[in-house]
A protein has these predicted regions:
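A short N-terminal interaction module
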Residues: 1-57
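A general structural signal for well-ordered alpha-helical segments in protein cores
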Residues: 7, 26-27, 57, 67-70, ...
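Conserved AdoMet
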Residues: 32-106
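Conserved SAM/SAH cofactor-binding pocket of Class I
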Residues: 96-191
Length: 191
């Protein structure tokens, strides 16, 4: 079986399950299995796929067909032009959150500030801000120790370790230090 045939199989299954981005998702899942960029696969659709990779791909297609978010299956999500690790212990960054990051950078772009990120999750907001606001520092807090592990990995991945800390604290935690900016983007509550 080649890459095109496998993508078509995945596309058919996802379409039948009413997954809107059936073609893109089937291509992305194959890129994960083959550990290649999607574009590399698309220019070499006749490449042969092993039976082992076929079964791995089918498992990912099954997860997606049950409406598991593609970001959790891929274990990453792009935010502020960077790829962030995500998993079920973190929320998936939303595109509209980038508007908040953009506004904050506009306001503080020439300043050195101290930032508190409440409910940091994957750390994407704080890491994105610190990558743009030179010499600023940040503290990300979260009640989930597992989310903080992901946030720390993301800070290492994006080389923002020297001016960032993560602590397992709740919203009502007290801090000795003062912050110039407090950010938070908690999950939406369904009404």
């Amino acid at each position: 079986m080649n890459a095109l045939e496998l993508i078509n199989i995945g596309e058919t299954e996802l379409r039948q399950k009413k997954i809107e981005s059936f073609r893109l998702d089937s291509e992305l899942l194959l890129s994960k299995i083959l550990n290649k960029k999607r574009e590399q696969i698309l220019i070499n659709l006749d490449q042969k796929i092993s039976q082992k990779k076929f079964f791995m791909y089918k498992r990912l297609i099954q997860r997606r067909s049950k409406n598991e978010p593609i970001a959790y299956i891929m274990e990453e999500k792009e935010f502020w032009s960077k790829n962030f690790l995500v998993n079920k212990d973190t929320l998936i960054p939303r595109p509209e959150t980038e508007l908040m990051v953009e506004k904050i950078i506009e306001i503080f772009k020439e300043k050195r500030i101290s930032i508190l990120d409440i409910g940091t999750g994957s750390g994407c907001i704080l890491i994105s801000l610190l990558s743009e606001l030179n010499n600023s520092k940040g503290l990300g807090i979260d009640i989930s120790k597992k989310a903080l592990i992901v946030a720390k990995k993301n800070s290492e991945k994006h080389k923002i370790q020297s001016n960032i800390k993560f602590l397992n604290k709740s919203l009502d935690a007290k801090f000795n230090e003062k912050f110039d900016l407090i950010v938070s983007n908690p999950p939406y509550i369904k009404s």
